[in-house]
């Protein structure tokens, strides 16, 4: 895992904006560990990954492992 972030109970709107910024700092293919307690995260994080092209490697709410997309 190249980086991780505990987003706590941050709402998904703010969460995905910050997540986008944090993933942009990683190299292609690197892994990011996210902890998100927001009740909408189990639906929102997978949907965001599909829309942005990042790969959701594992999900066990509240922990999500995301692989940054290739450029």
Predicted regions and their residues:
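Domain-level signature for proteins that mediate thiol-based redox and metal-cofactor handling
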Residues: 1-71
